[in-house]
Amino acid sequence: MSKLFIAVLLGSLLAIPAAAQTGQQSGAGSANPLSTWLRNAYMGNRNTIVRSAEKMPEENYGMRPGTQQEVRTFGQQVGHIANYNFLWCAQAKGEKNPNAGTNLEKLNTKAEFLKALNDAFAYCDGVYSSLTDASGTEMIDITQESGRQTRNLRMALLILNFAHNNEIYGNIVTYMRMKDIVPSSSEPRPQQQQPR
């Protein structure tokens, strides 16, 4: 996980000067290029995950890609994303996890999983929307899954959350492809009208 985190962080930092050179940064983004990039990346990933979870039929929420019971079902993958969005965004906010003690991987229906996912993303949306480059570089206390206490940059934790969402979305894509369902990130994009 740490190699993935470092790769995402370095990719983020390298993308900023390139975006600035091509004129993609403007307004508030030019004052906060790191947090603007992260917010936009998170929102794109968030929307892709929600659309894919909505697109998967209810009967496939219990499927696994094989016979191994330790591999999460599609629904459990959705619940896993919700669990970690609550955990890491609560820590980034400096709040108690509003979902503490509840394992969203143990839900039963598509409607329950979608509600948990949307609630978790709604909770995180405020964290990402209020993030600035300055607030992102503040050191915060973090409790890891093992219970170990550590300190890290707020933005580092939110980059980890984004990267983890992306990692689990990769699993979701596999489940969808196994059922011959086109994931939302691969859907055809509407053609834009060309000026005449």
Model-derived regions: residue spans:
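N-terminal secretory signal peptides that target proteins for export/translocation
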Residues: M1-S2
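Bacterial N-terminal signal peptides
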Residues: F5-P17
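Boundary at the C-terminal end of the N-terminal hydrophobic targeting segment
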Residues: A18-T22
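Short N-terminal segments immediately surrounding and downstream of signal-peptide cleavage
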Residues: G23-N47
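Short, contiguous alpha-helical
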Residues: R39, M43, N47-V50, Y61-T102, ...
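Well-ordered alpha-helical scaffold segments within catalytic/enzyme domains
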Residues: T48, S52-A53, C89, Y123, ...
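Short, flexible helix-adjacent loops and helix caps
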Residues: P57-Y61, K93, S129, D133-G136
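Acidic/histidine-rich alpha-helical segments that form the ligand environment
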Residues: K106-T143, T150-I168
